[in-house]
Amino acid sequence: MSVSEIFVELQGFLAAEQDIREEIRKVVQSLEQTAREILTLLQGVHQGTGFQDIPKRCLKAREHFSTVKTHLTSLKTKFPAEQYYRFHEHWRFVLQRLVFLAAFVVYLETETLVTREAVTEILGIEPDREKGFHLDVEDYLSGVLILASELSRLSVNSVTAGDYSRPLHISTFINELDSGFRLLNLKNDSLRKRYDGLKYDVKKVEEVVYDLSIRGFNKETAAACGEK
């Protein structure tokens, strides 16, 4: 094989990979659009009357996740399953955003942390890499950390809306998250930096709870703060 033939063959490989990446990008754009729609819907809980609409907004968000499932099913067909990490950077950020959105819905519904397995059911993907298109552990953790930031904001807006018990519940939840993350030996630089922001979320929520306790707005909050 001549030098020119070698490079012609290599160009064929490069062109084929570029075609795959372009197909992936198209699906990811659709995923990003649906994620924005879900986020816009859930952001409404921060408004004055948004707390009254939480069940309705969560139900509507779950309907949007059926569209997410469709897009992810399409994405799976765009590349060989064994090459997941070769193209992972294309959907990594939107998948982390979708984890956050799924976790936010579950928290609003039950005030609990969604498991990685439950997220994969909501998204219609696999929990284990051996089974193909899956939810990477670090992507799940990144989504959970985004949730913590969102909940710290919600604690402030809860007070504005006159819901004085919610910040206490959020404080308990975020402190449990912080304790959980302390058990992990995080090697990923991006994940470590995002985890560094969790302490500020914890502090922000604790300040809200403390402010409520000294102002006597909530007996439950005051009693909890007195126990600390």
Curated annotation (Swiss-Prot):
Its EC number is 3.1.-.-. Transmembrane segments: none annotated. It is an enzyme of class 3 (hydrolase). The keyword Nuclease applies. Residues 86-90 are annotated as: DNA/RNA binding. Pfam families: Translin (PF01997). Residues 177-198 are annotated as: Leucine-zipper. GO terms for molecular function: endonuclease activity; identical protein binding; mRNA binding; RNA binding; sequence-specific DNA binding; single-stranded DNA binding. It is found in: Cytoplasm; Nucleus. GO terms for cellular component: cytoplasm; endoplasmic reticulum; endoribonuclease complex; male germ cell nucleus; nucleoplasm; nucleus. InterPro entries: Translin, Translin_C, Translin_fam, Translin_N, Translin_sf. PANTHER family: TRANSLIN AND TRANSLIN ASSOCIATED PROTEIN X (PTHR10741). DNA-binding protein that specifically recognizes consensus sequences at the breakpoint junctions in chromosomal translocations, mostly involving immunoglobulin (Ig)/T-cell receptor gene segments. Seems to recognize single-stranded DNA ends generated by staggered breaks occurring at recombination hot spots. Exhibits both single-stranded and double-stranded endoribonuclease activity. May act as an activator of RNA-induced silencing complex (RISC) by facilitating endonucleolytic cleavage of the siRNA passenger strand. Ring-shaped heterooctamer of six TSN and two TSNAX subunits, DNA/RNA binding occurs inside the ring. This is Translin. It comes from Mus musculus (Mouse). The lineage of its organism: Eukaryota, Metazoa, Chordata, Craniata, Vertebrata. The gene is Tsn.
